[in-house]
C-alpha cells in the first residue's frame, strides 16, 4: 500500500512512502545534531541510503563488545540486521531513505543454467 504519512520527530521529519507486509520505505529529513532513540527491530533489517548531508549510524553489536560507527554521505548505503540496537544522528542537515525488510531465506534461487560470457 502506498501512503504519504508524514510525521514530525524531535530530530526532524519522517514520511512513509510505502508500507506493506514485505517492505517499508521512508524518506527522512534529519536536522543537524538530530538523533533518534537507541532501538532495535526484532524481525526487520533497517537500511539507510543518504541522498544529501551526512548521517552517522551507531550499531551496538550483539556478538562482541563493540559499537560500530559508520558515517554515510551522499550515495552511501548500509544496513543493520534484526536484533541489533542502533541509532542515527545527523552531522549535517540530511535527507535520507530508510528501508525495512524482513529476514527471508537467502538461498531462494534455483538455477536452470550457468552464467557465461558470449563472444
List each model region and its residues.
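Double-stranded beta-helix
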Residues: 7, 85-119
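A short, N-terminal "cap"/entry segment at the start of jelly-roll beta-barrel domains
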Residues: 4-27, 35-38, 68-70, 112-119
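Short, well-structured hydrophobic secondary-structure segments
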Residues: 28-43, 48
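Conserved hydrophobic/aromatic beta-strand scaffold that supports enzyme active sites
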Residues: 25-29, 47, 69, 77-79
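Short acidic-glycine-tyrosine-enriched beta hairpin
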Residues: 61-83
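Glycine- and acidic-residue-biased ligand/ion/polar-headgroup-sensing regions
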Residues: 43-62
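Short hydrophobic/aromatic-rich beta-strand segments that constitute the beta-sheet cores
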Residues: 37, 57-59, 98
